[in-house]
Curated annotation (Swiss-Prot):
Gene: FAM117B
Lineage top rank: taxon: Eukaryota
Residue ranges, compositional bias (Low complexity): 45-56, 108-136, 147-158, 207-220, 404-417
Spans annotated as Disordered: 1-310, 370-464, 556-589
Protein name according to UniProt: Protein FAM117B
Amino acid sequence: MSQRVRRNGSPTPAGSLGGGAVATAGGPGSRLQPMRATVPFQLKQQQQQQHGSPTRSGGGGGGNNNGGCCGGASGPAGGGGGGGPRTASRSTSPTRGGGNAAARTSPTVATQTGASATSTRGTSPTRSAAPGARGSPPRPPPPPPLLGTVSSPSSSPTHLWTGEVSAAPPPARVRHRRRSPEQSRSSPEKRSPSAPVCKAGDKTRQPSSSPSSIIRRTSSLDTLAAPYLAGHWPRDSHGQAAPCMRDKATQTESAWAEEYSEKKKGSHKRSASWGSTDQLKEIAKLRQQLQRSKHSSRHHRDKERQSPFHGNHAAINQCQAPVPKSALIPVIPITKSTGSRFRNSVEGLNQEIEIIIKETGEKEEQLIPQDIPDGHRAPPPLVQRSSSTRSIDTQTPGGADRGSNNSSRSQSVSPTSFLTISNEGSEESPCSADDLLVDPRDKENGNNSPLPKYATSPKPNNSYMFKREPPEGCERVKVFEECSPKQLHEIPAFYCPDKNKVNFIPKSGSAFCLVSILKPLLPTPDLTLKGSGHSLTVTTGMTTTLLQPIAVASLSTNTEQDRVSRGTSTVMPSASLLPPPEPIEEAEG
């Protein structure tokens, strides 16, 4: 077999073994790690010059596998079955070797089924799991650092991910130069059973299914730099990032997982033009954001759990000993109304409750600072303390206490109580007078903190409580003020315009007076003549048209016909404009 001397001066023997040939290239002392990141860009043009002779095909039944290494040295690969296509590879990115009788233009660790050839770069051993293609390295191989170890053109092994070894898309510039781009670009979705990884799939398939996890495991920048600069890694991992996100979604919240997946996909799309350090920084930022979102979501959950319910249970437990059961009953509906509507008005509730507690006694003032430091749990126990004071008010009602109760009751919503206000206000005058005296004060106090006073103490025994249930506007006082004057003044005001209309009909010269009077027909031409100063056509036409239908309802048919005929005859000589007013009426009508 022929030998070709590469750029680093090491011969690459190509042998046909078992119908296939494995060509390994690389010198013993040719590992130059500093050149790793710059090789794909510096030696790109030198490849084409040094790839003067195509690779040679040995006698075999497999496909032709051309080794186009990024360093500009192409290792010859045998195994072309009698006339297999010989092509000099120009690719700058490693991809996996070809399948049966398929031309491959990029070298990788290839595992071929029938008889095939794999060409690797540098001194790393070729790994072929095919029974037909058995590679004999020129010297004992060093221990491979990774599963898909492929040595770089400067004979320094670049650690590729297994997902990239199995399926690594070439860059866009080289893709058009290749003979079979649809085969060379092997995505994990296009993976066929004849693909080389299927034989050696037991070792390579499991890690290749989740390249992103391997990317996270690799801590060195060298593993990220070479394939990332070649343009593989974002595209390859982006295709398989979704299932990884889904796996996490089963363990975390769906909304959080969706946001994370969107952020992750966006980062992969944008990072194609970035450096590896920027990539790592962005990954770190995403992790920090995820941790923050976890903590924030848990914190909100804890708040939601504690604010409506835990505070209630604590309040009930505190009040079981000193307060009777009658006071505990209203506590449960309190939190439903106040917690839903007035969850944000915690400060106002505290202010109003402090006023009530100052009126009742100093014992409860001592209990207030105990619950105040916990802002979310403070309002429910304070509301219950107000309910306990209400229970005292039910037993010993006083004038000031009634005033405070009236202020709280006037702010709850109940239309039925609104009706009872108007009825009972007339029945019980002293209570309504007290309410009228108290309400302006209550409005001033009630605007600061509505509802919870009323919600805490139902007091069904006292009848005056129902008076204190107007709508949310707290307009109960206005209702009493409006009801009494309307009955005195506004009701005659409603009748007055009606009486004016009735009295206005015989006096004024409108069409309605003709309808109502109709006894003397002499006023009809007078009215038309009077109206002619303003609008002849409309008045005459309206009088004739209104007389016909309305007289039918008021008078007999005989008198109607006579008077209507007379009316038309009298109107005609006085104002002979009946034919023009009719179209004018139509236009105006």
